[in-house]
Amino acid sequence: MPIDKTPEKNAILFVWFNHYAGVLIKTPSKTIIIDPVDIRARSFPDSDAILITHEHYDHLDPRLIAEIQKATGCTIIADPASAQRLQHSIPPDKLQQIRPCDEIKVGEVSVKAEKCNHPATAPVSYIITSEDGVKVFHTADSLPFPELAAIGEREKFDVVFCTVGIAPGTSPETGFEIARLTKPQVAVPYHTNSTEYQQKFAELLKAELPRTACLIPELHKIYQVSKRK
């Protein structure tokens, strides 16, 4: 499942690789994996960083992460609870803990943690800004929260991943509320195994937020998103 091509200028490529929050993002110079579970390590022959949002089974697989890290030498960036679970399997110089408002650089790519409204120990969401300034908001499996409006206004997101199912309390409606608050150029409904939920999200978006495009992803397919003009 590696992305064997480079994004166009002012763009990123991404792949959704499980029914949860598993996303692979490729910028011009870096490959970043988020919440890898239910997939084989050999699917990721290249990785510069793995980001973990929280410690639940559908987001954190310590054995898989250790296998990918050993093969690629990548850096692991994780919330405090996940970092604690990884501390004995990841070299100390390759494991970085992150909390909301912290920022870590992966080369010229910025990784910033934000709040996540989800019943885990200390969950985070991630703002990833590419070398070209393309802004991606990976919201883990967060429910909406009021601060999203200010975050969206500040960041002017190009793409936001919105949970529409599986996680507690989530639905197409809560996913749409994340999009409504953040107002991205492109909204991606994920964290579901229901195409019906994704379609419902798309209908809400078209009716209530027509200036935001909906991209319904298929598993393992490569998509490109460009910086807003």
Language-model features: locations:
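Core dinuclear metal-dependent hydrolase active-site scaffold
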Residues: 1-45, 97-155, 170, 217-229
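Alpha-helix capping/helix-boundary segments
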Residues: 21, 57, 82-84, 102, ...
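Short, Asp-centered acidic motifs that coordinate Mg2+ and/or phosphate
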Residues: 31-32, 49, 159, 186
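Binuclear metal-ion centers of metallo-dependent hydrolases, dominated by the metallo-beta-lactamase
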Residues: 16, 90-107, 151, 176, ...
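Proline-aspartate-enriched helix->loop->beta-strand connector
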Residues: 73-74, 156-157, 161, 166, ...
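Active-site metal-binding motif and surrounding structural segment of the metallo-beta-lactamase
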Residues: 38-82, 154-161
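A short acidic, amphipathic alpha-helical/loop segment
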Residues: 63-68, 89, 147-151, 174-178
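Catalytic metal-binding/acid-base residues of hydrolase active sites
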Residues: 56, 82, 117, 143, ...
